[in-house]
């Protein structure tokens, strides 16, 4: 069922993004007087189609990995262009119209992101305060003088009020060499203490990096004691006699102070039996359990009892319509720049290409965010929409950015780029995009 849910959420997520993108092309083309012959979501065999009032065929196709808008064009051997309808063909349009039509797809993705973020910001944001809960021994954070209890209020001069805000600010520094400036102190005051943390090609080789943990910081989360919150039917823990509410004191003589201690202990011991000492309603009970082996990782089918988060550790931000709109535009701009910078760092070899993700990863994230709530899924949708818009603006033939380059050259030269050059460029671009997609899928499979 989980696989089916992931597939459905991937189809819904990609379907929304592709439809919005292609609708941008379609809407501007119709405003420019260009006849649209076909508006397709997906590729390959047509599953369902209908005729629009303007004569456009709308189609849903079998391979849901994209879409396209086919316009009347003299260069298309299948399209019958006469003197009567030549003005409705794409290639007969002035350069400004061509540029507007091509750029409308990515613009629609950015607009979708702004609208989604506007709704989320208007609804209000809630996040964990970026309080330092732990500093790893001998970590760069400890060596720099950071201590437990401080709150990160700025990263490189950018104000940060939540854990996610700190994470995003740190992610901007992936692959960099220099120093990260952290300002810590009281979030209610503008006065803070600054720490300079040296970095060299920071996390350049890391896959799915956790920037705070890389510095040796645990932010926002209160220490979680090893208390049983749930048990899986048929799991090793249930079979061993564990009960909800049991607090794990030790395992095989090793003290268990936090839930992470217990998880690491169990994961390292598949098919190995050991005794566990628990506190059950004030009495100590000894149980014997053997973790099941799941891909060489031990598991006992046990969930943690999460503590209540005190209100002092929660940051809430509400905005009015104008402020929410401004914040949505600014966040979209920041994420767009971050996307371009990350791609450029990848080209330079400053960050690992293992961070490229394909449709499998999108399906997994779409499913997990949907399970976390509608607002979380919408946040992912906005982020993915920005990524789609940015990628399509890359100056690669076949992508919208490549078409934009050709039309800019046409405007400068006063004539279109020779068709043979365009065809050869599109073939090279198609090969590059296909190779990139295969590499991303390879990364997805390697993570499974």
Predicted regions and their residues:
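Functional transmembrane alpha-helices
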Residues: 85-96, 210-255, 260-390, 405-428, ...
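Membrane-embedded helix-turn/re-entrant segments that form the catalytic/gating core
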Residues: 30-113, 185, 193-199, 204-210, ...
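PDZ/PDZ-like peptide-tail recognition elements
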Residues: 99-130, 168-170, 181-229, 275, ...
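Alpha-helical transmembrane segments of multi-pass membrane proteins
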Residues: 14-18, 70, 109, 113, ...
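PDZ/PDZ-like domain micro-motif
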Residues: 136-150, 168-169, 233-246, 265
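Terminal peptide-recognition signature
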Residues: 21-24, 60, 105, 141, ...
